Regions:
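A short glycine-threonine-serine/GTX helix/turn-capping micro-motif
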Residues: 190-197
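Bacterial N-terminal signal peptides that target proteins for export
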Residues: 2-14
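Extended, subdomain-level signal for the structured scaffold at the beginning of enzyme domains
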Residues: 6, 20-140, 147-152, 157-158, ...
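Short linear capping/connector segments at secondary-structure termini
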Residues: 184-189
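Class I SAM-dependent methyltransferase SAM-binding "motif I" and its flanking Rossmann-like core
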Residues: 163-165
Length: 248
């Protein structure tokens, strides 16, 4: 049995252990707003758009969330995950990790979810790929200063968004036509969503899981990850950073 099978078995076992915890959670609201309809059989394709300098937790955090989702009635993973870059050249992320992209922007499968982490400034070709792909996505989400990449497409113009608290001033200066929400863990606008810095991407990914499969599945996913953050259920939970002294 390989490591992935071992993990799946452990997660299935933990679902049983989760039941007592779920009973304790029963008092919490279970309604899901802005729900999304998952495919009956096919996997949901999730593209992680990366380039040099991509911040690891910004894309690996959401990746872990999506890969840990288990639907008891399914044999396979409900999400199909892959990386996309402008070329197949290895990407050197923050901290030096190297990632060889699965696809380029010219041959990537059409995504239903796009994850845009903090990274280097995008080329015109990458900007165009985001704009074109977002016409048919369920969710195009940025994490941290990935909001700058998403804003560069013009898709956020006239909408509200958030980003890493240390970049509030720069974002407001660069994109005055975007309503910056300081103190938001994440912000949703139709098929667009932006998360605050770093770990905020985990919460936004859990929120996407909730929109597809409901709050109980999202809770089980967080439980299996031993993730105790509650921000995915409260988009305004970054108030600590709304007026943080380190903000610029």
């Amino acid at each position: 049995m390989n490591a992935r099978s071992d993990l799946k078995q452990a997660l299935l076992t933990s679902l049983v252990l989760f039941v007592p915890v779920a009973i304790l959670m029963a008092a919490a609201p279970t309604e899901t707003t802005n729900s999304l309809k998952p495919p009956d059989k096919d996997q949901i394709p999730v593209a992680f758009l990366i380039s040099d300098g991509a911040v690891v937790i910004d894309f690996c955090g959401p990746w872990e969330v999506f890969q840990d989702v288990i639907i008891p009635s399914r044999q396979d993973m409900p999400f199909r995950l892959y990386t996309v870059a402008e070329t197949k050249k290895p990407i050197r992320t923050s901290g030096g990790m190297q990632v060889v992209p699965d696809y380029t922007i010219t041959d990537a499968p059409a995504p239903k979810v796009i994850v845009i982490p903090a990274q280097s400034d995008p080329s015109p070709a990458v900007v165009e790929w985001i704009k074109k792909s977002s016409k048919t996505t369920d969710v195009t989400m940025s994490v941290c200063t990935g909001a700058f990449v998403l804003a560069k497409t013009g898709l956020l113009t006239g909408k509200s968004a958030t980003t890493f608290h240390g970049a509030f001033g720069r974002f407001a200066m660069n994109y005055p036509d975007v309503q910056l929400k300081r103190g938001a863990r994440f912000v949703e606008n139709g098929n667009l969503a932006t998360a605050g810095g770093l770990s905020s991407g985990i919460d936004l990914a859990l929120r996407v899981v909730e929109r597809y499969y409901g709050r109980d599945v999202a809770k089980k996913t967080a439980y299996n990850m031993e993730y105790q953050g509650q921000g995915w259920m409260n988009p305004d939970s970054n108030q600590l950073y709304a007026t943080a002294l380190v903000s610029t």
